[in-house]
């Protein structure tokens, strides 16, 4: 094993030094947060959070573990186990989406914003991705969604917040939302 490989070392970091991921599209406070809080109170944190260093070198940006961090804050836990990754903005976006997209009960608005973030990040990578084929297919792969489904969610992400909320609350169908977003 390579002794220089610090990528997967687990370190304890102060919760106060960790800021949320910019434009994180997933809701953190939900009914599942209580279950998570109880689990952490009983068993501790089973999976380390994933962070990257902030540009100013003072603190960290959270990539995966927003709900775990929130649960720890509510429990008064001051330090959390973390893995520090070296990632550019695009790769950080991709990892953040992939870490969250497989959760149950994701709202259509969350999935739409997440897919758009990942799609834009992959597109931004450009040449490296072209060899791998259709960007939309790549975006949906982790969650088992087709490229066509990803494109529909991507379009939905342009819907105004009020109507997007209607889709989340099932007052407006997903298909209607996609059509309205395309107008």
Residue locations for each model-derived region?
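Short, charged/polar connector segments at secondary-structure boundaries
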Residues: 1-85, 92-102
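Amphipathic, charge-rich alpha-helical segments that serve as recognition/docking helices
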Residues: 25-27, 34, 70-158, 165, ...
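Basic, low-complexity intrinsically disordered segments
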Residues: 170
């Amino acid at each position: 094993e390579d002794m220089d490989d610090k990528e997967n070392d687990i370190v304890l970091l102060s919760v106060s030094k960790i800021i949320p991921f910019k434009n994180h599209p997933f809701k953190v406070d939900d009914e599942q947060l209580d279950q998570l809080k109880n689990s952490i109170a009983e068993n501790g944190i089973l999976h380390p959070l994933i962070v990257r260093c902030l540009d100013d070198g003072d603190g960290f940006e959270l990539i995966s573990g927003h709900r775990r961090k929130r649960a720890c804050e509510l429990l008064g836990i001051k330090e959390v186990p973390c893995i520090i990754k070296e990632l550019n903005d695009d790769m950080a976006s991709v990892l953040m989406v992939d870490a969250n997209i497989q959760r149950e009960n994701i709202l259509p608005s969350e999935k739409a914003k997440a897919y758009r973030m990942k799609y834009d990040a992959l597109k931004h990578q450009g040449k490296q991705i072209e060899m791998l084929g259709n960007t939309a297919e790549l975006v949906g792969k982790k969650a088992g969604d087709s490229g066509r489904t990803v494109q529909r969610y991507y379009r939905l992400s342009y819907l105004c917040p009020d109507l997007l909320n209607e889709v989340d609350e099932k007052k407006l169908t997903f298909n209607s939302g996609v059509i309205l977003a395309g107008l």
